[in-house]
Amino acid sequence: MKLAISNIAWTNEEEADVAAKLQELGVRYIEIAPTKIWSDPTKATIEQINEYIEWWKKYDIEIVAFQSMLFARPDLKMFESSELRDETRQYLADFLRLAGDMGASRLVFGSPKNRQRGRMSTEEADDIANRFFSELGDVAKQYNTMLCIEPNAPQYNCDYITTADEGARLVRAISSEGIGLHLDTACMALAGDDISKSIQDNGDILKHFHISAPMLDRVYDRDDVDYRAAADALKRIDYSGVVSIEMRPGEHGENVKRVEDAVSFVRNIFE
């Protein structure tokens, strides 16, 4: 298991202090929201990309995953029209290329509002999603990356693929080496999933994992998420991928300590 943390957990102004703390703690991997770095990441130059990679290398940290690709594009939709779907697919394909350039082998597709199906039947949505992700899986393989589908709970305004079982069924139906399953502790807890069973039933397709709390609250020992069940299940399936802490930042100036506390808690439970 490789421990990472997402860069959404601090402000840009705190990044150097957080990076130094992560180096001190021996955290060697980071997940990034590219939209936090560049206004349009798909237009980042190779010079900008290399500069960012090298900046983290100074702290012995490697970029291993992307998230929040559609954060700045609420206009892009999977199910609204074929034109918007094509535009969404191309935009995500550009992120797959960027991930390949940056050495990030996993991209988390959450984006609950971009995949709302509304009145569309589940069967029709499944048919569209299968073709949509199959094509992106081919692109992912081209760039030695993998797009990981994240079941998102209804509390996050998601109405398509809201449980771990639904996510697993879609990934198995797509059956692409470029598409994997991503699970998230908060999403599973909110959706009422059996966390242990969801992980153990899907060890063969589980390719990325988030340790989070509902509404991206601070990660600590809490009653609403069974982190110990998740940790035990990951050990049972001999999970060797990335486990990434995902939480929103607190007040400016307090996030170095929040990151340190979260890393300490997660290591105590998951390692």
Regions found by a protein language model. Give the residues of each.
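Histidine-acidic metal/acid-base catalytic patches
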Residues: M1-A4, A9-R28, R89, A93, ...
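Active-site-proximal loop/turn and secondary-structure-junction residues that shape catalytic pockets
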Residues: A9-T11, P34-K36, M69-A72, K113-R115, ...
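Active-site acidic/histidine proton-transfer and metal-coordination neighborhood
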Residues: A16-D17, K57-K58, D75-G180, L190
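Conserved alpha-helical segments that form or flank metal/cofactor-binding pockets of metalloenzymes
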Residues: W55, V64-F66
